[in-house]
Amino acid sequence: MSAAAGPQRKVYLHIGAPKTGTTYVQDRLSLNARSLAAHGVHFPTRTPMVSAGLFHFRAALDLLGQDWGGPAGHAEGGWAALVRRVKRRSGTVVISHEILAPATREAIAKAKRDLAGSEIHIVYSARDLARQLPAAWQESVKQGRKWTYRRFLSRIAHGRPWFYQALDLPTVLEAWGAGIDPAHVHVVTVPPKGAPRDLLWQRYCEVLGIDPTWAPRDSDRHNQSLGVAETQVIRKLNRRMDRQTRREASYDGLIREMLAQGELVGRVSQPVRMPPRLQSWAEAETERWLTWIRDSGVDVVGDLEDLRPLPLAEGERFVNPDKVSTKQQLRVAMDALSAMTREAARRPDPDQQLIRRVRTQAKRLRE
C-alpha cells in the first residue's frame, strides 16, 4: 500500500542526532526523490539546481535564527520556502537536518505552528556514546573548533556544549515531543559495528512507511572518521589560522571537504576512542536514556541494546589524541600540505583572470 494512503498529510521531522547516519539517509532520500514521490513520499527541494540537502540545511538555519555555512544571508527565508512546499504536498513529507535537534523551545513551537494541519511525527536517531563521543569531537574539529579531546570530554560530562544538547536523547525528545502523541515520536537506534550495511536504512524505511523497493539507488555519502593524528593536525590548523567555528565558507571546501573529509580519511591510523575512564559514566547516561524511553512510550525502531556503550575490545588500547607523537603528526601535515599544493596549482590565478578581463574590455572599447 502506498505511503500516501489516506487524506491527511504526514510530516516527519527528522531532527538528528548528528553523527548517526543522517548524511547517508538524506542523500538516499534525495537520490530517490522522483521514485518516492510516485508513491506519495516527498523530500522537497527548491529547484533542481539546489540539492534537497542544502535546501533543508538552509531552512533549518533560518528556523533556528542562525547564519553560517555559506554567504551572509544565504539561509534567509529558507524555512518559509520549505513550509510552502510541504503544504503543496499530500501523503508523506520528510524534513531532515541534524542541526534541528538542539533547537530552542521557541523555534520548536514555530515549526509546529507553521506545520499545523499536518500530522507531525518526530524522528530521532540515537547511537551509543562509546562511538558517538569520538565522532562528535571530530565533527566539532572539522567545523573549526580548537579544543583538545580532554577539554571537549570535560565539557560533555557537564552537558554544556551544543553537541551534547543535540545528543542527550531525553532533553531533545522532551522538547520536540511536547504536545505530540508518543506514538508519533520515533527513536531509531543506529546498528552496532559489523551490522548489515543496509540495516539503518531499513529502519528508516519502517518509520517513514517506505517500501525499500521504492528507493533502489544507494548512496555513497558517508561521513568517514579521521584517526587520532589526522584530527590533531586539523585541530592545530584551526588554531594556527584562528579559524572561526562553522562560519567561514571560504575555508570549508579546503579544510573540511578536501582535507577532513577527503585527503585525510581512510589512512592507516589509530581511531579516536572513548577513554576507558568514561565507561561507567557512559553506562549511567545510557541507563538514564533507556529509562526515559521506556517510561515515555515513544516508538522504538531497532534494538535498545544497540545504545549500550561497549568497552574497548580485548587487546585494544586507548590512544590519547592529545598526545600523538610529533612524528605521526608530521606525516599527516606533509600529506595535507601536498594536497593543498596540488589544489593551489589546479585553481586559476584570480589576479591573472582579472588582468585578462581588463585587457578584453579595453580591446572592446578601442574597437
What do the PLM-derived regions correspond to, one by one?
Residues 1-367:
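Anion-recognition interface
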